[in-house]
Amino acid sequence: PTLRVLHLEDNDADHALVVAHLRRGGIQADVHRVDNEADLTDALYDDWDLILSDYNLPGYSGLAALDKIRSMGKLVPFILVSGEIGEDIAVQAMRNGANDYLLKSNLARLAPAALLAIEANRTRIAKQQADLALSHSRQQLRELAQHLQASIEQERAAIAREIHDDVGGGLTAVKFDLSWILRHSP
């Protein structure tokens, strides 16, 4: 299957290099490039399998792009790709939800990192769906338990009324019998 990849990159040569490394790594990809915040915002209305982002963009940064993507509720795998990225920025990117970061000088890691990020995202989504299904099942179980408890209480009340009526009726008959005996005894 062909992956849909959004690439935030302002340099044509770097974009071509990323596309070449994806293909060299065996990834069939339809790669769409944007280089500014407005185009990114428009592109985020589509569904993507992977987002790759340069760190330094004109008037914009890869971290700002990541924040925008996450604030829109998009949980697409995100890899920061940059010519120069310090450890602090890499750590901040990972804390903000990036799946990985790569230096442009080490693009041989791009295809494996992309596949790993996509698989991790699929696993995360499957876990979320399973957690949601489990939560739904637990809620149904709670509702059934409450219904069962209410049914038990209703049945107990009905049995108690029936016993009360039977015993009450029996006692009334005994009272009548005793009254009759007392009236007719010497």
Residue ranges and their predicted role:
Residues 29-31:
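Short beta-strand elements in bilobed, periplasmic/extracellular small-molecule ligand-binding domains
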Residues 128-186:
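Coiled-coil dimerization/phosphotransfer module
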Residues 37, 57, 185:
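Hydrophobic pocket-lining residues within nucleotide cofactor-binding pockets
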Residues 33-42, 62:
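Helix N-cap/capping motif at the beta->alpha junctions
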Residues 10-11, 15, 55, 101, ...:
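Generic detector of well-ordered alpha-helical packing
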